[in-house]
Amino acid sequence: MDLAEYKSRYGGRDDAAPGWDAIDSRVREVYPGQEPKHWGTVIKHVIGGPDPIDGISAYSCTDGGIDHLHFITYGYTSLYYDEEAAGGDYSRFGFEMTFRLASKLPPLEEPMWVCNLLQNIARYVFKTGKWFEPYHWIPANGPVRADHGTDIVGLAFLTDPTLAPIDSPHGRVEFIQAFGITQSELDSFRDTKQTAEAIVEHHRKTNPLLVTDLSRKNG
């Protein structure tokens, strides 16, 4: 899309969010007719808000053999009207983050800790300028959910199994999923005994959508 077409289609609208709309369009293909649970910030990051991610949506999913919530961020990419971003190769960082949490449907509690986790990952990316690609990994420096006592203490990253990349008006957007890993798996990465790719693909055999289960034990 060239700048003239961009201005013609989106210009003059105070609420224009072509990047956000493009993400919504892709997600609706996967979850047609479903109204997600959504958490938004009070002040958008672009105008000085403290949280880098402006919104997080969660969809109920029963695919892959595990009931779960599928979280999707809005904030790593250019979401709002921006003539300088129009027609780019990649939209800002070029990805949005996703996360799948094993959960009863509907969930018994508000999973706000997931929103905090995703915001903390984004703070790292925005502060350092370093982004994640499939089969990268990071330690969480403790349980991913502090009040749970879970053995999940790190994250590996992969291409989201169901959300295909999109070409938004601001450039390409990929969907990178975080998957919870245990201390022994982190240790195997550090000792180069196994790669993150090997661990992810091992779990994919029995957990095709790579749903994070907080009850999964170390070992």
For each predicted feature, which ranges?
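Acidic, proline/glycine-rich low-complexity IDRs
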Residues: 1-93, 97-219
